[in-house]
Amino acid sequence: MLLDVDPDTYAMKSHLVPDRLGVKAYLELPFNTPWRTLIISDDARDILSSQLVLNLNEPCAIEDTSWIKPMKFIGVWWEMFTGNQKTWAYSDDTLAKPGVTDYTQLKPNGRHPANTENVKRYIDFAAKHGIDGVLVEGWNEGWEDWAGYRKNRQFLFDKPYPDFDLPALRDYAKEKGVKLIMHHETAANAADYDLQLDRAFQFMKDNNYDAVKTGYVGAIIPRSEHHTSQWMIDHARNVIERAADYEIMVDSHEAPRPTGLCRTYPNWLAQESARGGEFESFGGNPPSHTCILPFTRLKGGPMDYTPGLFETRLSYYNEGKDSQAGTTLARQLALYLTMPSPMQMACDLPENYERFPDAFQFIKDVPVDWADSKYLEAEPNQYITVARLDKNSDDWYVGAITDGNSRVAEIDLSFLPKGKKYKATIYSDAPDAHWKDNPQAYQIKTVEVKPGKKLKQYLAPGGGAAIRIQSVDAK
């Protein structure tokens, strides 16, 4: 269901997305309609902390959830968005057909980063820095003409490209203690994905993959269906249920808007389902964007926003590409708190993290699984400050972000247990930082803080701050 808004009166009307025949839903008597909810408060923090949508879903349907593990990951992904001519395709031969063409006979284009040597580089980086997994996009046959052709079969999900030595990489990752993350781009052919699903998931289990990122770029097949129609919602649920049967975790992109089903199927670790970080390559997201999403998109479940972008100007890679992210570097650290997800990416290139190792330390340290959350201040479209307690320690983390205006965040430390001394490591915007003119200006300092006191922290235009708070006698 969508909401249509009258631009003059701001009145809202429900809009059920129909199928290609105009039918809004196929139902059998008797039937129950889904819950429809409104979250209303005169304090924006109440909206952020509300669990109403999640709690209206059925309890967990998976008896043994011990295999579901939150994770932090990097990936062969962003380098295809930077404008440096890298591509998902192994060859430029658009007549290649998955399962028919002998790809070993094709001429490689030399611009394919999902190759054995490069993936090993990512695995090494992940192992060195304690990152759990490595996503690899562009590993399988079918990318030569994948966008917009609407074929009955675009991809095969068990056929690696010749330069992607899957058995060698599988064993190398295992040796290094790193998990490879599967990628299933469907080119929006959900019908064919249903047909391949069991074979694809079995292939994953046979090769030590426990998690998959799915994608549905383009117009949906069955033709003229919509991303949020009844058919696609049923498809999405089927994928999650079948994934659970194989003990596979899912991060779905271009998926229907979430409605809290991750409570019932917690293997659905994350979804995109809104304008995410990849749009920093397509003109950039405005600073206010991530001050809105926690009030809207995230009420239905965690979002794979792909934070952690340190090089925000794409002209760094290609002078002809002027796209710039609406963020400072410090704000990217804060997003790990304000845009929480149990499957959280560090999206930038390893070499960019190596340029800023002190800032990258926060990404290495910040958890992805939380025991408690306290929203300290918030206004939609303007600012958010939140504190979260690590599920596996007594450490608290604070994230604060602002829109295109500078402001001073007031961080009330009353959430800290009394009777202890604490130190706060603060990653913040430098005084001259600005998302557009000086995005990489940041500073790091450690100060003593006390429960019940207020910490004032400057946030630059489009900026933010990320803080780790530890007991000084913590081991």
Which role does the model predict for each range below?
Residues Y246-I248, S252-T425, D429-A433:
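Active-site-proximal substrate-binding groove within the catalytic cores of carbohydrate-active enzymes
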Residues M80-T94, G99-N118, H183-Q196:
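Active-site mouth loops of central-metabolism enzymes
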Residues R45-D46, F81-N84, A126, E141-G148, ...:
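Flexible loop/turn segments at secondary-structure boundaries
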Residues P30-P34, I39, N55-Q85, D92-Q105:
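Feature activates predominantly on carbohydrate-active enzymes
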Residues M1-E63:
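N-terminal accessory beta-strand-rich subdomains and adjacent acidic, glycine-rich linkers
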Residues T402-K475:
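C-terminal beta-sandwich/jelly-roll accessory domains of carbohydrate-active enzymes
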Residues N118-W139, D206-D210:
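Catalytic domains of carbohydrate-active enzymes, especially glycoside hydrolases
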Residues G138-Q324, T328:
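Aromatic- and carboxylate-enriched substrate-binding clefts and catalytic-loop regions
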